[in-house]
Amino acid sequence: MHLIDTKPSRIEALGATFNQLQQGLTTIKWLCQLTQLLQHHRGATMAYLSGSQDFLLQIEQLQLSIESARYLITELNNNNYPCIPQDQLNNINNNWKTIAIGWQQDQVMHNFEFHSHLIDSCNKLLRLCMMEQLKPILLHSNSSHQALLEEVFVALPNSIENLAMLRGLSTNVAVIKACGKDSHAKISFLIKETEQQNKNLVQAVNTLSPDSYLVKTYQKPLHKFLLTVKMSILESPEVTADSSLLFTMSTDIIDTQWLAVSQGIQRIEDSAYRALIKA
């Protein structure tokens, strides 16, 4: 009869790896939440700065939620297994404080760029946490997890960010009822990028996660939103788009996309715990 290895060193190592994995996954989930909130804040503040007072209550609520998310991420990172370099976390906190204090005095496109830089930093941290916390465990047990990690932590967030930027720019144009040359070029580019990224995502989902229904559920709303922007902004002699409608349409899609990220993270989490048990 073979006895199970219950040496303290093995059990302690397993416990330490479990705690590190759990903290890493929780940090990743809160980074996703923070990024989603910052994207929403960018779009709402752009609309407000363009002249739509209707977004002020949203902005105030978003800022409270962002503060809570930042606090929780910072507290997590102060525990035994930090996965975010302290200098990078400090940069995110400081950049947000700068935005929170001064956004009402910013020009619309400066506000757009400040937010976009901060969101890019959050997405880079998301990928860093994935590389540090998840990739070693998952790829050690099954190399096929690489494609799933790329889909959840690279492809989907990139696609979401392009659509979130398009939300901000198109809503801004709809509020002011004018589309300058630069805005026209940026919106056209983002539509093409979004269409191509979405095509790639659908193909990846059909291969990797045929049971992942969330990516499939927003296909018709996404096509409708992109067509609305094309027809009422890019191809119309006068901007006829309704700013509130564009913001709501795009936000519903973005929220569903972030739910798809959460669904992917849950699959990865389940696989990581199974791999840990087998280690």
PLM regions with names:
Residues 1-279:
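Hydrophobic alpha-helical segments
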